[in-house]
Amino acid sequence: MNQVRKWNIIGGRVIKTGIAVFLTVLVCEFFNIPTIFAVITAIVTIEPTATDSIKKGLVRFPASTIGSAYAMTFTFFLGHQALSYALAAMFTIVTCQKLRLHAGTLVATLTAVAMIPITADHYFTAFLIRLATTSTGIIVSTVVNFFILPPHYVKTISGCTEELFVKTANIMEEWLTALMDGKVIIKETTYNLSKLTVLLHKAVQFVQYEQKDWKYHRHTKKEMRSFLLVQKQLHLLQQIIYHIDNLARAPIETCDWSQNEKEILRRTIHSIISILRNHCEEIDEEHFKLIDELDKQFWTNKNDLAHCKPNQYHHHFSSKSIILFEVLSIHDMLEELKQIFEKYESENQLNCSVH
C-alpha cells in the first residue's frame, strides 16, 4: 500500500515559494524598487491551486492598496505616532471586511503598519511604489504557481483512498471484536474512527483542489478516468464511514444474539473486511449468501418488534435491527464500489484495444 507521506519536509509548494521569492527579488532589483513588501506578497500568494492564487491575488491587490492609502494618510497628518499605527490597522481591517476583501485583510494590515516607520516624506510616491511592489509579488507568484510544478493531486488522492480502504477495514475488525465480546466500543476505536474522518476530509479537499485547476492543465483520458474513479470511491467510502460511525454508537451490550445469528454476523463482517482490504475489486458468492441470511434476520427482527405492545417497547428499531441495517447498508456501498471498479477496468481495456 502506497501511503501518503506524512513527513515530506520539502514539497512542491515549498519549492515554488522559494522560486517565487527569488524571482520577485530579481524583478524588484531590476526596477530598483523595495523588495520586502513584494516578497511578503509573493509568499502569501502561493496557494494550493493556481485558481486560488489568481482569485486571492485579485483580492489582495485592492486590499493592499487600501492599507497603503490609510498608512500614508495617517502618517501625513499624525506622523510616526502610536495612534497612526492603530488607526491604520483598524481602518484597513474594517474597510476590507466591509468590501468583503477577506483574503487580503491580513496582508493589507501588515502592509499598512510596516509602511509607517519607513516613510518620512513623499507619501504619494511611496504609495505608488507600494502598489508596484504588491503587483510584482502577486504576478510573479501566480505565474510560478501556474507554470512551475503545477499542482497534481491525483496520486495523493489515490494514496489517501488506498489508506482509507485499509483503515476502514481495520476499524470494522475492532468493532467486530467488541461485538463478539459483547463489550462497549473502546476509546481507541473511537479515536481511530475520528482520525479516519480527518483523513477522509483531507482526501475530499484534495479532490476539490484538483477540480479547481482541472481546466488549466491538459490531462489524458486515463488520468481523467483515474480521477473520476477515486472521486466516486471517496463518495462511497464517506457513506461507509458514516454507517460504521453509527455501528460504533449502537448499544452492543444490550443485544441478545443467538449462537447462529452471531456466527452469521461474524462471518459477514469478516467478508466485508476482506472485500475492503481488496479495494472492493471482487465479491464472491459466499458473501452474497451471507448477506441473504443477514437480510432475513433483519426482517425477522423487524417483524417481531412490530408485534410488541406499546408499553413493552417504544422504539421502531431494536439494537439488533440497527446493527443489521447498518451492516446491510455497508454491503450496498461495497456493491456500488465493485461496479465502479469494473466499469473503470472495462473502459481501460477498451481504450487499450483501440490503441
UniProtKB/Swiss-Prot annotation:
Topology class, membrane: Multi-pass membrane protein
Protein's cellular compartments: Cell membrane
Segments traversing the membrane: 19-39, 74-94, 109-129, 131-151
Keyword annotations: Cell membrane, Membrane, Transmembrane, Transmembrane helix
GO cellular component: plasma membrane
Pfam families (UniProt xref): ArAE_1 (PF06081)
InterPro entries in alphabetical order: ArAE_1
Family note: Belongs to the UPF0421 family.
Protein name: UPF0421 protein BA_2743/GBAA_2743/BAS2557
Upper classification of the organism: Bacteria, Bacillati, Bacillota, Bacilli, Bacillales
